[in-house]
Regions:
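Polysaccharide-binding surfaces and accessory modules of carbohydrate-active proteins
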Residues: 399-462
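Extracellular glycan-targeting catalytic surfaces
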Residues: 1-110, 311-313, 350-371
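Polar/charged side chains located within well-ordered beta-strands of beta-rich proteins
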Residues: 30, 49, 72, 83, ...
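Catalytic and substrate-binding regions of extracellular carbohydrate-active enzymes
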Residues: 247-405, 410-411
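Beta-strand-rich recognition/accessory modules
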Residues: 437-498
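Extracellular polysaccharide-recognition and catalytic grooves
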Residues: 64-73, 80, 84-276, 281
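Short amphipathic alpha-helical segments
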Residues: 1-3, 111, 218, 251-261, ...
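Short, solvent-exposed secondary-structure capping/transition elements
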Residues: 36, 164-168, 400
Length: 498
């Protein structure tokens, strides 16, 4: 019997009801229990499912095939029949310009003893991998979570199978960059470089753990082992409620050897990466991280003990949908007037530059978004116990129908002199701008805007799988007659820098 690892423990608790488990899940359950299994029927029935031009559905096809090829490899079966399936899948449309897809294809080749095509790993100077699932969209290539983590997981297996030093060096660089997306306690920054539809905190915590689990099996560096130990504890302490993809269970068991415990590695206080316009400061009490790059992602996040602003940035109305949330820009657009200027300070930083609001979503799912040409000049400055966020909106046709939103997580939200809201309730606030306090037991964050001519909406949320796990939405409705905005976010009760 293979020793129980965190994902296996969660997984087996979910597949106890074997009658409702798929044939593939039953096969993996037998493998983990050291029972004999036959994959013939699974291989025979493995087929490409229609994608309707969806990159995400194409990914699911390849991930299902990878689950089969990896399971087949683990039980030392001949890979001839599955190799034929790999060749059939390659004849279907898939984005050959995307290194995410290329590594999926290469891994299936390696596991079925076929010649392994070159992946052509492309990393930014900092070590971040460029992920672009959609074709002809290089300006949107970015280290999005969770695909960046999945890419690192696949790369770990490929390094193990091929023993290539160049791939191992790329993997280590990628892992060191991924540490930028963790706070000082190795907790993932829930919404950093994460689109809302991929923002389930449970699922992403699982992938963070699995990535560092794979990474430490390849290279036992102190910071990676410290990350794995912390993430493993976080996962064990979480009541994981969703179904786990069989592939992740299989990959966890593939790397059975656990690293030796090591001295805890303290992450650097400052986060600094010009290639992703990323800067931040983290301490044991909290973390503030800001960026001007992304694609339908936010401008940053703030954590102070048990209070968080998990994401903030511009978005189109209605507030109920996040398809129109966020900014767009990457290393290709970071030049000239859009060049980000980063300055590190003692226990702080400043970030200045220009970024663009994403295209306004179309009402039809098969049409591209409407280009509104709305730009933001942004200055984000962390000084002592305050983040100053200054924005200037620019656009020939104005910016009506937009808002600037803060997604927060706290025990309660107090609108000064008006009311106090609790998460998950139907009560809400809509009115003039007042000081807004996000409060929990150990800390609070105060949100002020000295001069604002529009209305503010404060809406309690469920705080589970949607909206990056936030339980409050604070939205400032913008109007074209005001272009300059200045928010002040103050840290209180416990000094952020202590």
């Amino acid at each position: 019997m293979i020793d129980k690892l965190p994902l296996q423990s969660h997984y087996e608790a979910r597949v106890e009801d074997l009658e409702n488990s798929s044939e593939l899940e039953l096969a993996i359950h037998k493998y983990l229990s050291n029972q004999s299994i036959c994959l013939k029927n699974l291989i025979d029935t493995c087929a490409w499912h229609e994608t309707l031009m969806s990159a995400e559905k194409t990914v699911e096809n390849w991930k299902y095939l990878l689950t089969l090829t990896l399971l087949n490899y683990c039980i030392s079966n001949s890979g001839k029949e599955l190799a034929a399936k790999v060749r059939l899948f390659e004849q279907k449309p898939w984005n050959q310009d995307s290194q995410y897809f290329r590594i999926l294809v290469a891994l299936n080749h390696a596991l079925t003893k076929m010649s392994v095509p070159e992946v052509g790993i492309s990393l930014l100077e900092s070590g971040a991998a460029l992920i672009d699932l959609q074709e002809y969209s290089s300006w949107q290539a970015f280290p999005y979570i969770p695909h960046h983590l999945e890419f690192g997981i696949y790369l770990s297996i490929l390094v193990y199978l091929t023993k290539r030093d160049d791939l191992k060096k790329s993997l280590i660089r990628l892992g060191k960059w991924q540490l930028n997306t963790l706070d000082a306690n190795y907790k993932p920054l829930t919404a950093l470089f994460v689109r809302e539809q991929n923002g389930d905190p449970e699922e992403n915590l699982l992938l963070y753990y699995l990535f560092f689990h794979c990474l430490t099996a390849i290279t036992e560096e102190n910071e990676f082992i410290s990350a794995l130990e912390a993430l493993s504890k976080q996962l064990k302490n979480r009541n994981y409620s969703k179904k786990i993809h069989p592939l992740w269970i299989l990959i966890e068991s593939f790397f059975k050897r656990l690293p030796e415990k090591t001295t805890f590695f303290t992450l650097p206080e400052h986060i600094y990466d010009p290639s992703t316009s990323l800067v931040g400061y983290r301490s044991s009490n909290g973390c503030t991280v800001c960026t001007l790059h992304g694609g339908r992602t936010g401008l940053g996040c703030i954590k102070l003990k048990d209070v968080e602003i998990v994401n903030f940035g511009p978005q189109y109305l209605p507030l109920s949908e996040c398809l129109g949330f966020g900014i767009e820009g990457n290393h290709l657009s970071d030049h000239g007037l859009r060049k980000s200027i980063i300055e590190l300070k003692k226990q702080g930083f400043s970030l200045k530059g220009c970024t663009r609001l994403v295209d306004q979503p179309s009402s039809s799912p098969f049409q591209i978004g409407l280009f509104r040409g709305i730009w933001l000049e942004v200055t984000q400055e962390l000084v002592q116990d305050r983040l100053n966020l200054k924005t200037t909106f620019l656009g020939l046709d104005g910016w009506e129908g937009t808002a600037f939103s803060f997604f927060a997580k706290a025990e309660k939200c107090r609108i000064k002199g008006v009311k106090t809201l609790l998460p998950g309730t139907l009560d809400r606030y809509e009115g003039n701008a007042q000081q807004i306090s996000l409060e929990s037991k150990a800390a609070s964050l105060n949100l002020n805007i000295p001069s604002f001519e529009g209305t503010v909406q404060v809406i309690p949320l469920a705080g589970k799988h949607d909206f990056w796990g936030a339980n409050f939405l604070i939205a400032y409705i913008l109007h074209s007659d005001q272009k300059n905005y200045h928010w002040q976010i103050e840290f209180s009760k416990e000094n952020f820098m202590d």
